[in-house]
Amino acid sequence: IVMANKTQLATAGEPQAAVVINNSFIDGLTKQLEEKCKYGLSFPKDYNLSNALMGAYLTLKETKDRNNKPVLESCTSTSIANSLMNMATLGLSVQKKQGYFIAYGGQCQFQRSYFGNITIARRYGMKDIHTEIIYDGDKFKYHIEDGNKILDSHEQDFMNIDNDKILGAYAVVLMEDGTKHLEVMNMKQIKQAWSQGYGYK
């Protein structure tokens, strides 16, 4: 069995080399980030840096650009390293769907997902978040007080719910200290935000 494995490794030299490069690449990034910890960088207490980087690298191996070419071939190694470091310094994990890698013009970028944004917000005192859609025919009212948006009311009739008649959306964030924050976007703003994301048509 041992001989068979050795022969198999010898004939499959390229995949084996990829594994070695993978491990040394991740080890190098891990050491760089651990070195930065001496100068103030910190990670969440439940964050396993090497596991997150290895999981991200495995995800990158399966990720393709819009031309269906593997990202590890079409993107520069510097941009791949930077995207991995960006993910790690945010304390996020692609395996937990907290972000994803995208290729733009030969450059790999890490982009936070909705779950990544929620994870970061919770670290900074967010207790909960509630989101609602505003449809044509809804009665929605808010005011601004000391620079903060305050929700007054949102009355919605079941018959107003129609995906072709969405006027906007809002989110109410409840903080650990009991304060609330309101964010409101009209449909034009939402589409503009979508247009900056990967895969929007």
Region locations from a protein language model:
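Structured, charged N-terminal subsegments at the starts of enzyme catalytic cores
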Residues: 5-6, 10-16, 20
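Binding-interface segments
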Residues: 17, 21-201
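Short, Lys/Arg-enriched N-terminal segments with co-localized hydrophobic residues
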Residues: 1-2
